[in-house]
């Protein structure tokens, strides 16, 4: 068959064929690249309205290095979908309906640090959160409220609630700042708590009950998720009347599609693989096509420095922070490059020492060097 863009076809050893392309056609491509600039390669083939939910770190800790891989994958996926002609919304799901014990302990941790900043010698309990990020949130509370809470009793329910809320807001502010330093911003920060507060969770459960996909056992309300391919049925409401984590998820998935999105894409860590079947099952039980939800699972990431895997942050704490332990070490651009250099489905190891090198074995430097040479060549023509 004729190939007008090819001038010659040559066999080049066993298993290889060389295609020689017409120079004038290649020249035309370069002209289009120059004319279209950043829009080169874009198309209108998509035409869908898509919401991509990614990162969604709990509001009781900073964005971790693993969360950084999630951010790089999700943000790039959004850009690709938009370039293909889709209307894309970047969404961060705030898990602010977390177990009250977790968030209350986080609030207590911030309160203790807050009083320490004011010169008190309060002890940090074993159940409390460590890490410099807790001190950062306490500093923000101090900056906003001064000594207003210095004599407060953390065992008082009102004080507990106040510091839970202040700590959550302070942590989310820190998360936003870390993500912006990584070049990632969101169109929507969606609160899980609102789903419970305005009845959307209760309504979703009611729909599943009306459609006959629940039963009661041992005082709890169960979802017949096995009828949709899940490996076992799931509890929706515990025997004490409290909802499980799944109820917020199913109401959130429903809400996305109710907002008019044709497709929803979630970017999750591989440790959440078990949630995929039950999430799709809940959509089917609610009467939606589960194929409208896609889940991209990515593998873990580790940091290597001095030939050793880094196990703890350079700041106090037992987690690796995206900003302090990676961006501040190698820069935003290098961090994003390394996160995207391997398939999301493969485990990733980032060598900090390699990323800092100004030699060709550092892939970031090699690409930047090639770009600089190309620009130089253009400037001399």
Where are these regions (language model features)?
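NTP-dependent nucleotidyl-transfer catalytic core
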Residues: 1-381
């Amino acid at each position: 068959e004729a190939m007008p863009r090819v001038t010659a076809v040559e066999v080049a050893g066993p298993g290889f064929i060389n295609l020689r392309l017409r120079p004038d056609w290649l020249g035309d491509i370069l002209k289009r690249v120059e004319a279209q600039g950043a829009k080169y390669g874009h198309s209108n083939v998509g035409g869908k309205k898509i919401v991509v939910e990614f990162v969604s770190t709990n509001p009781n800790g900073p964005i971790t290095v693993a969360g950084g891989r999630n951010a790089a994958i999700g943000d790039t996926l959004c850009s690709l979908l938009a370039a293909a002609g889709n209307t894309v919304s970047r969404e961060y799901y705030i898990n602010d309906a977390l177990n009250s014990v977790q968030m209350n302990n986080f609030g207590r941790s911030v309160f203790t640090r807050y009083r320490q900043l004011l010169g008190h010698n309060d002890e940090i309990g074993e159940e409390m959160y460590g890490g410099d990020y807790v001190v950062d949130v306490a500093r923000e509370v101090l900056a906003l409220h001064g000594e207003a809470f210095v004599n407060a009793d953390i065992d008082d329910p009102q004080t507990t609630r106040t510091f839970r809320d202040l700590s959550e807001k302070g942590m989310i502010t820190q998360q936003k700042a870390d993500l912006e330093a990584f070049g990632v911003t969101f169109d929507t920060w969606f609160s899980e708590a609102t789903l419970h507060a305005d009845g959307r969770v209760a309504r979703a459960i009611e729909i599943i009950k009306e459609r006959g996909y629940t039963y009661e056992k041992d005082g709890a309300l169960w979802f017949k998720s096995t009828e949709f391919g899940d490996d076992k049925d799931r509890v929706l409401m515990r025997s004490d009347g409290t909802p499980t984590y799944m109820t917020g998820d199913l109401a959130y998935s429903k809400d996305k599609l109710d907002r008019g999105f044709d497709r929803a894409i979630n970017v999750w860590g591989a440790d959440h693989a078990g949630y995929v079947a039950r999430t799709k099952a809940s959509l089917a039980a609610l009467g939606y096509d589960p194929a409208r939800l896609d889940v991209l699972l990515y593998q873990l990431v580790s940091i290597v420095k001095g030939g050793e895997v880094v196990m703890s942050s350079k700041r106090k704490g037992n987690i690796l922070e995206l900003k302090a332990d990676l961006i501040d070490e190698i820069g935003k651009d290098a961090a994003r490059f390394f996160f995207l250099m391997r398939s999301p489905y493969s485990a990733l190891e980032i060598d900090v020492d390699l990323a800092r090198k100004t030699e060709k074995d550092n892939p970031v430097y090699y690409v930047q060097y090639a770009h600089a040479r190309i620009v130089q060549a253009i400037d001399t023509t």
